[in-house]
Regions:
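Catalytic helix-loop patch of NAD(P)-dependent Rossmann-fold dehydrogenases
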Residues: 6, 11, 20, 25-86, ...
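Alpha-helical segments that scaffold the active site and NAD(P)H-binding pocket
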Residues: 2-3, 57-62, 112, 116
């Protein structure tokens, strides 16, 4: 954040995670999870993402307040926090989702094929990284 300020960078896009919500089923009417769902991470990964979101939000607000006090334009300071989900599943037709027609090339559909008996085993090439 200091480097952003030093180099006159005032916009940041952060790849966060939906894990910041934690167990959304603890609240009524929160599935599917709306953006106004209260934050409540339940693991270290989610807490880390939530903490970074807080740091970004605090920094953007501090810079805006500083510039406002100096009677300078402050609106150019922005932060975007993108909370991704890792959805899996498939449309029953197999046209889209994790049950592709033909040979799958992604890990999740390959694992699904092993689990359902469509494939005997999962081959890992190299060291698996």
């Amino acid at each position: 954040m200091r480097s952003m300020t030093r180099h006159n960078v005032s916009n940041i896009v952060f790849s966060s995670s939906a894990t910041v919500y934690g167990d959304a089923t603890r609240f009524p009417n929160m599935i599917p999870i709306p953006e106004h769902c209260p934050i409540g991470p339940t693991n270290t990964y989610g807490r880390t993402k939530s903490t970074i979101e807080d740091v970004i939000t605090d920094h953007v607000n501090a810079e805006r307040n500083r510039l406002k006090k100096e009677s300078k334009p402050f609106e150019h300071w922005n932060g975007a926090l993108l909370r991704y989900f890792n959805p899996c599943g498939a449309h029953p037709s197999g046209i889209m989702g994790e049950d592709p027609q033909g040979v799958p090339y992604n890990l999740l559909p390959l694992l699904g094929h092993v689990a359902t008996g469509k494939r005997d085993k999962l081959l890992v090439f190299g060291d698996g990284t």
